[in-house]
Protein backbone atom coordinates (compact mmCIF):
# COMPACT_ATOMS: atom_id res chain seq x y z
CA UNK A 1 0.00 0.00 0.00
CA UNK A 2 2.83 2.37 0.89
CA UNK A 3 4.43 1.50 -2.43
CA UNK A 4 1.34 2.59 -4.36
CA UNK A 5 1.08 5.76 -2.28
CA UNK A 6 4.72 6.56 -3.09
CA UNK A 7 4.12 5.98 -6.78
CA UNK A 8 1.09 8.29 -6.64
CA UNK A 9 3.08 11.02 -4.92
CA UNK A 10 5.85 10.71 -7.51
CA UNK A 11 3.30 10.97 -10.34
CA UNK A 12 1.79 14.11 -8.85
CA UNK A 13 5.24 15.63 -8.42
CA UNK A 14 6.07 14.74 -12.00
CA UNK A 15 2.94 16.44 -13.28
CA UNK A 16 3.73 19.55 -11.25
CA UNK A 17 7.24 19.66 -12.68
CA UNK A 18 5.86 19.41 -16.23
CA UNK A 19 3.35 22.17 -15.55
CA UNK A 20 6.03 24.39 -14.09
CA UNK A 21 8.30 23.88 -17.06
CA UNK A 22 5.80 23.99 -19.91
CA UNK A 23 2.53 25.42 -18.71
CA UNK A 24 3.33 28.27 -16.36
CA UNK A 25 5.27 31.43 -17.07
CA UNK A 26 8.50 31.62 -15.15
CA UNK A 27 8.81 34.25 -12.47
CA UNK A 28 12.49 35.15 -12.12
CA UNK A 29 13.67 37.14 -9.18
CA UNK A 30 14.54 40.05 -11.48
CA UNK A 31 11.02 40.43 -12.91
CA UNK A 32 9.95 44.06 -12.68
CA UNK A 33 6.83 45.98 -13.64
CA UNK A 34 7.07 49.05 -15.81
CA UNK A 35 3.77 50.54 -14.67
CA UNK A 36 3.21 51.85 -18.20
CA UNK A 37 1.87 50.60 -21.50
CA UNK A 38 4.49 49.11 -23.83
CA UNK A 39 5.98 51.42 -26.45
CA UNK A 40 5.22 49.33 -29.52
CA UNK A 41 5.37 49.83 -33.28
CA UNK A 42 2.90 50.08 -34.85
CA UNK A 43 0.72 51.65 -32.18
CA UNK A 44 -2.04 49.03 -32.05
CA UNK A 45 -3.12 49.90 -28.51
CA UNK A 46 -6.89 50.41 -28.42
CA UNK A 47 -7.54 49.87 -32.12
CA UNK A 48 -10.56 48.05 -33.53
CA UNK A 49 -9.97 45.31 -36.08
CA UNK A 50 -12.10 42.95 -38.15
CA UNK A 51 -11.97 39.24 -37.43
CA UNK A 52 -9.65 37.37 -39.82
CA UNK A 53 -7.41 40.36 -40.51
CA UNK A 54 -3.72 39.50 -40.79
CA UNK A 55 -2.06 39.21 -37.35
CA UNK A 56 -1.26 42.47 -35.58
CA UNK A 57 2.44 41.69 -35.24
CA UNK A 58 4.43 44.42 -33.53
CA UNK A 59 7.92 45.42 -32.44
CA UNK A 60 9.20 47.32 -29.45
CA UNK A 61 10.23 50.84 -30.43
CA UNK A 62 13.46 50.25 -28.48
CA UNK A 63 15.43 47.66 -30.45
CA UNK A 64 17.80 46.93 -27.56
CA UNK A 65 16.00 43.83 -26.28
CA UNK A 66 16.86 40.14 -26.22
CA UNK A 67 13.35 38.75 -26.43
CA UNK A 68 9.71 39.71 -26.23
CA UNK A 69 7.15 37.38 -24.64
CA UNK A 70 3.54 38.13 -25.54
CA UNK A 71 0.31 36.47 -24.46
CA UNK A 72 -2.94 37.41 -26.23
CA UNK A 73 -6.18 36.18 -24.66
CA UNK A 74 -9.77 36.85 -25.64
CA UNK A 75 -12.67 38.13 -23.57
CA UNK A 76 -14.74 35.27 -25.03
CA UNK A 77 -12.00 32.68 -24.67
CA UNK A 78 -8.89 31.55 -26.47
CA UNK A 79 -5.22 32.33 -25.96
CA UNK A 80 -2.14 32.48 -28.18
CA UNK A 81 1.51 33.25 -27.47
CA UNK A 82 4.58 34.60 -29.20
CA UNK A 83 8.24 34.58 -28.19
CA UNK A 84 11.01 36.24 -30.16
CA UNK A 85 12.54 39.56 -31.17
CA UNK A 86 9.07 40.81 -32.04
CA UNK A 87 5.47 39.68 -31.61
CA UNK A 88 4.97 37.23 -34.49
CA UNK A 89 1.69 35.34 -34.16
CA UNK A 90 0.73 32.19 -36.04
CA UNK A 91 -1.82 33.18 -38.71
CA UNK A 92 -4.20 30.25 -38.18
CA UNK A 93 -4.15 30.65 -34.39
CA UNK A 94 -4.70 34.41 -34.76
CA UNK A 95 -7.68 33.94 -37.08
CA UNK A 96 -9.23 31.44 -34.69
CA UNK A 97 -8.76 33.84 -31.77
CA UNK A 98 -10.25 36.83 -33.58
CA UNK A 99 -13.23 34.83 -34.85
CA UNK A 100 -13.91 33.51 -31.35
CA UNK A 101 -13.85 37.06 -29.98
CA UNK A 102 -15.89 38.84 -32.65
CA UNK A 103 -17.68 41.67 -30.84
CA UNK A 104 -15.34 41.30 -27.84
CA UNK A 105 -11.73 42.19 -27.19
CA UNK A 106 -8.26 40.67 -27.06
CA UNK A 107 -5.95 41.60 -24.18
CA UNK A 108 -2.18 41.58 -24.66
CA UNK A 109 0.38 40.96 -21.92
CA UNK A 110 3.92 41.96 -22.91
CA UNK A 111 7.14 41.00 -21.15
CA UNK A 112 10.52 42.13 -22.47
CA UNK A 113 13.87 40.54 -21.64
CA UNK A 114 16.99 42.70 -21.90
CA UNK A 115 20.43 42.43 -20.26
CA UNK A 116 19.29 39.67 -17.91
CA UNK A 117 16.25 41.60 -16.68
CA UNK A 118 12.59 41.05 -17.45
CA UNK A 119 10.05 43.88 -17.51
CA UNK A 120 6.29 43.35 -17.69
CA UNK A 121 4.17 46.20 -19.03
CA UNK A 122 0.57 47.06 -18.36
CA UNK A 123 -1.90 45.06 -20.44
CA UNK A 124 -3.57 46.68 -23.43
CA UNK A 125 -6.68 45.80 -25.43
CA UNK A 126 -7.53 45.42 -29.10
CA UNK A 127 -11.23 45.34 -29.95
CA UNK A 128 -12.69 42.91 -32.49
CA UNK A 129 -15.51 44.55 -34.40
CA UNK A 130 -18.87 42.84 -34.88
CA UNK A 131 -18.71 44.12 -38.49
CA UNK A 132 -17.10 41.78 -40.99
CA UNK A 133 -14.50 42.80 -43.53
CA UNK A 134 -15.20 40.24 -46.21
CA UNK A 135 -13.20 41.86 -48.99
CA UNK A 136 -10.24 39.79 -50.17
CA UNK A 137 -7.72 42.58 -50.09
CA UNK A 138 -6.46 46.00 -51.08
CA UNK A 139 -5.08 47.48 -54.26
CA UNK A 140 -2.72 50.45 -54.16
CA UNK A 141 0.05 52.23 -56.01
CA UNK A 142 3.60 52.13 -54.69
CA UNK A 143 5.86 54.97 -55.76
CA UNK A 144 9.08 56.57 -54.59
CA UNK A 145 8.24 60.02 -53.20
CA UNK A 146 11.10 61.67 -55.07
CA UNK A 147 8.81 63.57 -57.48
CA UNK A 148 11.41 64.37 -60.16
CA UNK A 149 11.59 60.87 -61.66
CA UNK A 150 9.11 58.04 -61.84
CA UNK A 151 11.25 55.20 -60.57
CA UNK A 152 9.76 51.77 -60.07
CA UNK A 153 6.07 52.67 -60.05
CA UNK A 154 3.65 49.81 -59.70
CA UNK A 155 0.07 48.81 -58.95
CA UNK A 156 -0.03 46.09 -56.30
CA UNK A 157 -2.59 44.07 -54.38
CA UNK A 158 -2.44 42.66 -50.89
CA UNK A 159 -4.34 39.84 -49.24
CA UNK A 160 -5.43 41.57 -46.02
CA UNK A 161 -5.97 38.23 -44.26
CA UNK A 162 -2.33 37.22 -44.76
CA UNK A 163 0.88 39.09 -45.53
CA UNK A 164 1.00 38.15 -49.22
CA UNK A 165 1.47 40.95 -51.76
CA UNK A 166 1.17 40.55 -55.54
CA UNK A 167 2.13 42.86 -58.40
CA UNK A 168 -0.70 43.72 -60.79
CA UNK A 169 1.30 45.84 -63.23
CA UNK A 170 4.65 47.51 -62.68
CA UNK A 171 7.15 49.64 -64.55
CA UNK A 172 9.52 46.67 -64.73
CA UNK A 173 6.96 44.98 -66.99
CA UNK A 174 6.25 48.10 -69.05
CA UNK A 175 9.37 50.31 -68.71
CA UNK A 176 9.13 54.08 -68.80
CA UNK A 177 5.39 54.24 -68.12
CA UNK A 178 3.54 55.79 -65.22
CA UNK A 179 0.53 53.86 -63.90
CA UNK A 180 -2.18 55.53 -61.89
CA UNK A 181 -5.88 55.83 -61.21
CA UNK A 182 -6.69 52.12 -60.94
CA UNK A 183 -10.34 51.71 -60.02
CA UNK A 184 -12.54 48.66 -59.43
CA UNK A 185 -16.32 48.86 -59.58
CA UNK A 186 -17.54 48.95 -55.98
CA UNK A 187 -14.68 46.58 -54.96
CA UNK A 188 -15.50 44.15 -57.82
CA UNK A 189 -12.36 43.61 -59.92
CA UNK A 190 -14.37 42.08 -62.78
CA UNK A 191 -14.72 45.73 -63.79
CA UNK A 192 -11.47 47.64 -63.44
CA UNK A 193 -9.76 50.56 -65.15
CA UNK A 194 -6.16 51.72 -65.10
CA UNK A 195 -4.55 54.77 -66.70
CA UNK A 196 -1.07 54.82 -68.19
CA UNK A 197 0.83 58.01 -68.97
CA UNK A 198 3.85 58.41 -71.21
CA UNK A 199 4.54 57.31 -74.77
CA UNK A 200 1.79 55.05 -76.04
CA UNK A 201 -0.36 55.85 -73.02
CA UNK A 202 -4.01 54.98 -72.72
CA UNK A 203 -6.79 53.71 -70.52
CA UNK A 204 -7.00 49.99 -69.80
CA UNK A 205 -10.56 48.77 -69.33
CA UNK A 206 -11.00 45.19 -68.17
CA UNK A 207 -14.51 43.73 -68.15
CA UNK A 208 -15.03 40.09 -67.23
CA UNK A 209 -11.45 39.21 -68.14
CA UNK A 210 -11.33 41.03 -71.49
CA UNK A 211 -8.64 43.73 -71.68
CA UNK A 212 -9.12 46.74 -73.96
CA UNK A 213 -6.86 49.77 -74.33
CA UNK A 214 -8.75 52.95 -75.17
CA UNK A 215 -7.47 56.33 -76.34
CA UNK A 216 -9.78 58.75 -74.52
CA UNK A 217 -8.15 61.95 -75.81
CA UNK A 218 -10.06 63.78 -78.55
CA UNK A 219 -9.83 67.16 -80.23
CA UNK A 220 -12.65 68.34 -77.98
CA UNK A 221 -11.42 66.98 -74.65
CA UNK A 222 -7.73 68.05 -75.01
CA UNK A 223 -6.34 65.25 -72.81
CA UNK A 224 -6.83 61.63 -71.84
CA UNK A 225 -9.13 60.73 -68.97
CA UNK A 226 -7.87 60.12 -65.44
CA UNK A 227 -9.12 59.96 -61.82
CA UNK A 228 -11.76 57.46 -62.92
CA UNK A 229 -14.78 56.06 -61.06
CA UNK A 230 -17.26 53.36 -62.15
CA UNK A 231 -21.02 53.72 -62.31
CA UNK A 232 -22.53 50.97 -60.11
CA UNK A 233 -24.25 49.35 -63.12
CA UNK A 234 -20.81 48.65 -64.58
CA UNK A 235 -21.21 50.27 -68.01
CA UNK A 236 -20.09 53.85 -67.43
CA UNK A 237 -16.81 55.28 -66.15
CA UNK A 238 -16.56 58.90 -65.01
CA UNK A 239 -13.19 60.56 -65.62
CA UNK A 240 -11.48 63.91 -65.29
CA UNK A 241 -9.72 65.43 -68.29
CA UNK A 242 -6.82 67.64 -67.27
CA UNK A 243 -3.19 68.61 -67.41
CA UNK A 244 -1.11 67.86 -64.30
CA UNK A 245 1.85 70.01 -63.29
CA UNK A 246 4.25 70.24 -60.34
CA UNK A 247 6.08 73.13 -58.74
CA UNK A 248 8.78 72.74 -56.10
CA UNK A 249 9.46 75.02 -53.15
CA UNK A 250 12.86 76.12 -51.89
CA UNK A 251 13.63 77.60 -48.50
CA UNK A 252 10.26 76.66 -47.01
CA UNK A 253 8.85 73.71 -45.13
CA UNK A 254 6.78 72.78 -48.17
CA UNK A 255 8.09 70.48 -50.87
CA UNK A 256 5.69 70.43 -53.78
CA UNK A 257 2.46 71.84 -55.16
CA UNK A 258 0.47 69.87 -57.74
CA UNK A 259 -1.90 71.91 -59.89
CA UNK A 260 -3.95 71.71 -63.09
CA UNK A 261 -4.14 74.35 -65.82
CA UNK A 262 -7.47 72.97 -67.00
CA UNK A 263 -9.75 70.19 -65.85
CA UNK A 264 -13.16 68.93 -66.95
CA UNK A 265 -15.34 65.90 -66.22
CA UNK A 266 -16.74 63.38 -68.70
CA UNK A 267 -18.35 59.93 -68.69
CA UNK A 268 -17.27 57.07 -70.95
CA UNK A 269 -19.83 54.50 -72.09
CA UNK A 270 -17.67 51.37 -72.17
CA UNK A 271 -20.20 49.53 -74.37
CA UNK A 272 -19.89 51.93 -77.30
CA UNK A 273 -16.67 53.82 -76.47
CA UNK A 274 -18.62 57.07 -76.54
CA UNK A 275 -17.91 60.08 -74.35
CA UNK A 276 -20.88 61.76 -72.69
CA UNK A 277 -20.26 65.46 -72.14
CA UNK A 278 -22.14 68.31 -70.52
CA UNK A 279 -21.51 72.05 -70.92
CA UNK A 280 -21.92 72.28 -67.13
CA UNK A 281 -18.84 70.09 -66.69
CA UNK A 282 -16.74 71.66 -69.48
CA UNK A 283 -16.39 75.23 -68.25
CA UNK A 284 -13.60 77.67 -67.50
CA UNK A 285 -13.74 76.33 -63.95
CA UNK A 286 -11.66 73.27 -63.06
CA UNK A 287 -13.86 70.21 -62.49
CA UNK A 288 -12.05 67.22 -61.00
CA UNK A 289 -12.35 63.92 -59.04
CA UNK A 290 -15.76 62.57 -60.14
CA UNK A 291 -17.54 59.82 -58.17
CA UNK A 292 -20.99 58.30 -58.70
CA UNK A 293 -23.45 57.98 -55.85
CA UNK A 294 -24.29 54.51 -54.53
CA UNK A 295 -27.36 54.30 -56.79
CA UNK A 296 -25.73 55.97 -59.80
CA UNK A 297 -28.24 58.82 -59.93
CA UNK A 298 -25.74 61.53 -58.98
CA UNK A 299 -22.19 62.38 -59.94
CA UNK A 300 -20.17 64.11 -57.23
CA UNK A 301 -17.13 66.17 -58.18
CA UNK A 302 -15.04 69.16 -57.10
CA UNK A 303 -14.77 72.49 -58.90
CA UNK A 304 -12.50 75.52 -58.48
CA UNK A 305 -12.34 78.93 -60.14
CA UNK A 306 -9.47 79.48 -62.58
CA UNK A 307 -6.47 81.46 -61.40
CA UNK A 308 -2.87 82.02 -62.46
CA UNK A 309 -1.10 78.89 -61.30
CA UNK A 310 1.45 78.25 -60.00
CA UNK A 311 1.83 81.91 -58.95
CA UNK A 312 -1.63 82.03 -57.35
CA UNK A 313 -1.66 78.46 -56.03
CA UNK A 314 -3.01 79.61 -52.65
CA UNK A 315 -6.21 80.84 -54.35
CA UNK A 316 -7.27 77.37 -55.49
CA UNK A 317 -10.39 76.62 -53.42
CA UNK A 318 -12.51 73.67 -54.55
CA UNK A 319 -16.25 73.44 -53.97
CA UNK A 320 -17.99 70.09 -53.61
CA UNK A 321 -20.75 69.72 -56.22
CA UNK A 322 -23.07 67.17 -57.74
CA UNK A 323 -25.07 66.79 -60.95
CA UNK A 324 -27.83 64.31 -61.81
CA UNK A 325 -27.08 61.42 -64.17
CA UNK A 326 -29.63 59.28 -66.05
CA UNK A 327 -28.01 55.92 -66.76
CA UNK A 328 -30.84 54.70 -69.01
CA UNK A 329 -30.54 57.70 -71.32
CA UNK A 330 -26.85 58.34 -70.77
CA UNK A 331 -27.50 62.00 -69.98
CA UNK A 332 -26.53 64.55 -67.36
CA UNK A 333 -28.99 66.78 -65.56
CA UNK A 334 -29.30 70.50 -66.22
CA UNK A 335 -28.58 71.83 -62.72
CA UNK A 336 -25.43 71.72 -60.59
CA UNK A 337 -25.88 71.56 -56.82
CA UNK A 338 -23.11 73.09 -54.69
CA UNK A 339 -22.95 71.13 -51.45
CA UNK A 340 -19.92 72.87 -49.93
CA UNK A 341 -18.69 76.23 -51.22
CA UNK A 342 -14.90 76.46 -51.09
CA UNK A 343 -14.43 80.20 -51.77
CA UNK A 344 -17.08 81.09 -49.17
CA UNK A 345 -15.58 78.92 -46.41
CA UNK A 346 -11.97 79.56 -47.54
CA UNK A 347 -11.40 75.80 -47.74
CA UNK A 348 -10.91 73.22 -50.46
CA UNK A 349 -13.14 70.12 -50.70
CA UNK A 350 -11.97 67.22 -52.88
CA UNK A 351 -11.97 63.44 -53.30
CA UNK A 352 -15.60 62.81 -52.44
CA UNK A 353 -16.27 59.10 -51.96
CA UNK A 354 -19.84 57.96 -51.16
CA UNK A 355 -20.30 54.82 -49.09
CA UNK A 356 -21.87 51.96 -51.01
CA UNK A 357 -24.86 51.82 -48.67
CA UNK A 358 -25.71 55.45 -49.50
CA UNK A 359 -25.36 56.73 -45.94
CA UNK A 360 -22.08 58.66 -45.91
CA UNK A 361 -19.92 60.87 -48.08
CA UNK A 362 -16.24 61.02 -47.13
CA UNK A 363 -14.02 63.76 -48.53
CA UNK A 364 -10.80 65.69 -47.91
CA UNK A 365 -10.62 69.24 -46.57
CA UNK A 366 -7.53 71.42 -46.81
CA UNK A 367 -6.75 75.12 -46.88
CA UNK A 368 -6.11 75.14 -50.64
CA UNK A 369 -5.50 73.09 -53.76
CA UNK A 370 -7.09 70.14 -55.51
CA UNK A 371 -4.43 67.52 -54.75
CA UNK A 372 -4.66 66.82 -51.00
CA UNK A 373 -1.77 64.35 -50.78
CA UNK A 374 0.51 67.40 -51.14
CA UNK A 375 -1.27 69.46 -48.46
CA UNK A 376 0.03 69.02 -44.92
CA UNK A 377 -3.26 70.19 -43.41
CA UNK A 378 -5.50 67.83 -45.43
CA UNK A 379 -7.99 65.98 -43.22
CA UNK A 380 -10.86 63.54 -43.69
CA UNK A 381 -14.42 64.74 -43.19
CA UNK A 382 -17.72 62.89 -43.24
CA UNK A 383 -21.12 64.05 -44.48
CA UNK A 384 -24.31 62.33 -43.35
CA UNK A 385 -26.28 62.07 -46.60
CA UNK A 386 -29.53 61.74 -44.63
CA UNK A 387 -29.13 65.10 -42.91
CA UNK A 388 -26.49 66.91 -44.97
CA UNK A 389 -24.47 67.56 -41.81
CA UNK A 390 -20.68 67.25 -41.92
CA UNK A 391 -18.03 66.73 -39.29
CA UNK A 392 -14.28 66.31 -39.10
CA UNK A 393 -13.14 62.74 -38.51
CA UNK A 394 -10.99 63.65 -35.53
CA UNK A 395 -10.78 59.98 -34.56
CA UNK A 396 -8.93 59.22 -37.80
CA UNK A 397 -7.04 62.44 -38.54
CA UNK A 398 -3.55 63.42 -37.43
CA UNK A 399 -1.42 66.57 -37.55
CA UNK A 400 -0.12 65.41 -40.94
CA UNK A 401 -1.77 64.79 -44.29
CA UNK A 402 -4.67 62.36 -44.75
CA UNK A 403 -5.71 61.93 -48.37
CA UNK A 404 -6.81 59.09 -50.69
CA UNK A 405 -9.57 56.94 -49.20
CA UNK A 406 -12.13 54.31 -50.18
CA UNK A 407 -14.88 52.16 -48.66
CA UNK A 408 -15.22 48.43 -48.06
CA UNK A 409 -18.09 46.67 -49.80
CA UNK A 410 -20.28 46.65 -46.67
CA UNK A 411 -19.46 50.34 -45.92
CA UNK A 412 -18.36 49.58 -42.34
CA UNK A 413 -14.64 49.95 -43.07
CA UNK A 414 -12.52 52.45 -44.92
CA UNK A 415 -8.88 52.65 -45.94
CA UNK A 416 -6.90 55.85 -46.33
CA UNK A 417 -3.40 57.18 -46.94
CA UNK A 418 -1.68 59.12 -44.17
CA UNK A 419 1.70 60.78 -43.66
CA UNK A 420 1.28 60.79 -39.87
CA UNK A 421 4.54 58.97 -39.16
CA UNK A 422 7.08 61.27 -40.80
CA UNK A 423 5.26 63.83 -42.95
CA UNK A 424 6.67 62.37 -46.17
CA UNK A 425 5.71 58.74 -46.79
CA UNK A 426 2.04 57.86 -47.14
CA UNK A 427 1.11 54.59 -45.47
CA UNK A 428 -2.21 52.76 -45.42
CA UNK A 429 -4.52 52.79 -42.40
CA UNK A 430 -7.87 51.10 -41.83
CA UNK A 431 -10.71 52.08 -39.53
CA UNK A 432 -14.28 50.99 -38.86
CA UNK A 433 -17.47 53.04 -38.80
CA UNK A 434 -20.71 52.04 -37.11
CA UNK A 435 -24.31 52.84 -38.05
CA UNK A 436 -24.19 56.11 -36.08
CA UNK A 437 -21.01 57.28 -37.81
CA UNK A 438 -18.66 56.61 -34.89
CA UNK A 439 -15.17 55.88 -36.18
CA UNK A 440 -12.58 53.70 -34.44
CA UNK A 441 -8.88 54.42 -33.95
CA UNK A 442 -7.14 53.58 -37.26
CA UNK A 443 -4.57 50.81 -37.47
CA UNK A 444 -1.59 50.55 -39.82
CA UNK A 445 -1.81 47.80 -42.44
CA UNK A 446 -0.23 44.77 -40.69
CA UNK A 447 3.09 43.31 -41.83
CA UNK A 448 4.91 40.19 -40.63
CA UNK A 449 7.82 42.22 -39.23
CA UNK A 450 6.38 45.74 -39.37
CA UNK A 451 9.39 47.72 -38.20
CA UNK A 452 11.75 46.04 -40.65
CA UNK A 453 9.20 46.27 -43.48
CA UNK A 454 8.26 49.92 -43.13
CA UNK A 455 11.81 51.10 -42.46
CA UNK A 456 13.29 49.26 -45.42
CA UNK A 457 10.45 49.60 -47.95
CA UNK A 458 10.99 53.23 -48.95
CA UNK A 459 7.79 53.60 -50.95
CA UNK A 460 4.76 55.83 -50.64
CA UNK A 461 1.39 54.08 -50.80
CA UNK A 462 -1.55 55.88 -52.39
CA UNK A 463 -4.84 55.36 -54.22
CA UNK A 464 -5.88 52.44 -51.95
CA UNK A 465 -9.08 50.55 -52.63
CA UNK A 466 -10.73 47.34 -51.45
CA UNK A 467 -11.34 44.39 -53.77
CA UNK A 468 -13.74 41.57 -52.93
CA UNK A 469 -11.58 39.07 -54.86
CA UNK A 470 -8.05 38.98 -56.25
CA UNK A 471 -7.47 41.10 -59.36
CA UNK A 472 -6.70 38.87 -62.34
CA UNK A 473 -4.85 40.84 -64.99
CA UNK A 474 -2.59 39.27 -67.62
CA UNK A 475 0.61 41.33 -67.37
CA UNK A 476 2.15 39.66 -70.45
CA UNK A 477 -0.92 40.51 -72.51
CA UNK A 478 -0.83 44.07 -71.16
CA UNK A 479 2.83 44.34 -72.20
CA UNK A 480 1.99 43.18 -75.72
CA UNK A 481 -0.95 45.56 -75.98
CA UNK A 482 1.04 48.53 -74.70
CA UNK A 483 3.78 48.14 -77.28
CA UNK A 484 1.63 47.17 -80.25
CA UNK A 485 0.26 50.73 -79.96
CA UNK A 486 -3.25 49.67 -80.92
CA UNK A 487 -5.88 51.76 -79.19
CA UNK A 488 -9.62 51.93 -79.61
CA UNK A 489 -10.55 55.55 -80.23
CA UNK A 490 -13.55 57.11 -78.58
CA UNK A 491 -16.10 59.41 -80.13
CA UNK A 492 -18.33 62.12 -78.74
CA UNK A 493 -21.98 61.19 -78.30
Residue spans for each PLM region:
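Positively charged n-region of N-terminal signal peptides that target proteins for export
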Residues: 1-5
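Sequence signature of WD/YWTD-type beta-propeller architectures
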Residues: 24-493
